[in-house]
Amino acid sequence: WICIKTCRTDGSNRAKHSRQIIHMGNPFQTDTIRIVTVSGRIASGSTTLAKELARELGWKHIEGGEIFWEAVRKRLALNPKETNLRPDEEDILFDKQLTAILQNERELILETKLAGFNAQGVEGIFKILVICEDEHGNDQTQIRIDRLANRDHNSVHDAKEEVLEREKNDLDKWRKLYAHEDPNWTYYDKTYYDLVI
């Protein structure tokens, strides 16, 4: 059993939040899975899911992107949305560390935006994508902005700026590094994942 906080919009586009208990049954065999990756767009609920999975399975949880980004951000004196100012070498170094974790660790819930993408072809990895979409598959950006504002106790304006700028900056950087500048590439492409929640 796992408890997940869900949100959706009603007809007026206001967020309706609820907690839902979901019986996961046996979504994967833990004897063949060494690592579960959890990825999602900013404030989609990926951290909540990763923490709950780690607690439920008794596995270690690493929030890799935040640990990495916070250290780099502080060292370079950048604000949270200035991911475009992070040197490419920092991303490449992080990818090497992430690859080593994906190849060697066990009983780990690894949460980073690129974890599912980077885990392609690695044995023993179960890749989860957390989305915040309406019934038509459209991203619910305003809900994610509201979630970020509530979670970090920021103004809605600051949260909106962070979500929109940081996502754009991340995608621009990663498209350059990993997708030959393909303007359609995203790390949240559902084909990279074993399960989409």
Predicted regions and their residues:
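Post-Walker A helix-loop "phosphate-sensing" segment adjacent to the P-loop in P-loop NTPases
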Residues: R55-I62
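ATP-dependent small-molecule kinase phosphotransfer cores
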Residues: E63-E123, N138-Q142, D146, H153-E162, ...
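Glycine-rich phosphate-binding P-loop
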Residues: V38-K51
